[in-house]
Design a protein with these regions (language model features):
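Polytopic transmembrane helical bundles with strong interfacial aromatic enrichment
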Residues: 1-168
Length: 168
């Protein structure tokens, strides 16, 4: 379905007369929006679907437990989560350079204050994903060896960073 979306966008870009020619800055913004939707969608999935489902699966004594989620779903979802976070930030950085400057936006230059705020929030969120959430999820999912105490701490830390991203 993602590939079909790209194909349809390419067809629209080639067919619609208003576009006229291939436009890298507009493509970058489009990719920024698509990757941002993917990132935030997965963020909401983790916070509002997977985390509560894991708790229910742990409490369900007669059920299959949370193993399938932890073994098959979470690693794949976390891969898309990390990659969409990186793609969102990188395409956003390129788009910022096209509208007045990457550094100017981060410095809240006149006319770039709101986009600069968004850039800072996105940067904090990216940091949370790669520096806090992902290393702790590796412990939780057994990708990185950790004691039971370290896993308990990792669950709390990852959850707080993820919830912070929901607020941002």
């Amino acid at each position: 379905t993602i590939a079909l979306g790209f194909v349809l966008a390419l067809v629209a870009a080639l067919v619609l007369p208003s576009i006229g020619r291939f436009n890298i800055p507009e493509l970058t913004v489009w990719l920024h929006v698509i990757s941002g939707i993917t990132w935030v969608g997965l963020l909401y999935y983790f916070n509002f679907v997977q985390v509560p489902a894991m708790g229910e699966a742990l409490a369900d004594e007669g059920g299959p437990g949370p193993a399938a989620i932890g073994k098959y779903i979470a690693p794949r979802a976390l891969l898309w989560f990390r990659m969409s976070a990186a793609a969102t930030w990188l395409t956003g950085a390129y788009a910022l350079e096209n509208v007045g400057g990457f550094v100017a936006a981060f410095m809240f230059a006149p006319g770039l204050q709101m986009i600069g705020l968004g850039a800072w929030l996105g940067t904090i969120m990216l940091f949370n994903v790669w520096v806090i959430i992902w290393p702790n999820q590796q412990k939780i999912l057994g990708i990185k060896e950790a004691s039971a105490e370290e896993i308990a701490k990792a669950k709390f830390t990852a959850a707080m960073a993820s919830r912070t991203n929901v607020v941002l």
